[in-house]
Regions:
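Flexible helix-coil transition and linker loops at the boundaries of alpha-helical arrays
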Residues: 59-72
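Residue signature of alpha-solenoid helical repeat architecture, marking inter-repeat boundaries
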Residues: 27-28, 73
């Protein structure tokens, strides 16, 4: 009798947990993905951070005419953070593209500095062999 009661409680807990996870997975807000990407960066899980920042960019397309100020800022931040992650991975071409995108969206000193640092890094690196 006790075993059956424990089994029922365990089953209900599992079902409740499953439903919470399912509902939580449907939150496709750009802000959630931006926060998750930042968390992954803090933990050093860069591949997952890339996916999250790219999801922010996918969810807020620039062709969308009614983009809010907050979404515009999130989009610039996602490009900036993606550029930083790409530099950590040594993907300089991708980093420069994202840094330029972030500067185009938010022409701030920090975004400009990032573009210039990546360009300087590319100038200092040895030339790639031509195929």
């Amino acid at each position: 009798m006790l075993f059956k009661s424990i089994h029922n409680v365990t089953g209900r807990c599992f079902l409740s947990l499953f439903l919470l996870i399912l509902v939580g997975c449907k939150d496709d807000s750009p802000d959630r993905h931006l926060q998750l990407g930042n968390w992954y960066v803090q933990k050093g899980i860069l591949d997952e951070a890339v996916l999250e920042f790219r999801e922010v960019i996918r969810l807020i397309p620039l062709t969308y005419k009614d983009i809010s100020k907050e979404e515009f800022k999130m989009l610039g931040t996602a490009h900036y953070n993606l550029a930083l992650v790409y530099t950590k991975k040594g993907w300089w071409d991708f980093a420069l593209k994202e840094a330029q995108n972030s500067f185009n969206l938010q022409p701030t000193a920090s975004h400009y500095d990032l573009v210039q640092l990546i360009k300087k890094r590319e100038e200092l690196s040895p030339q790639k062999p031509q195929s």
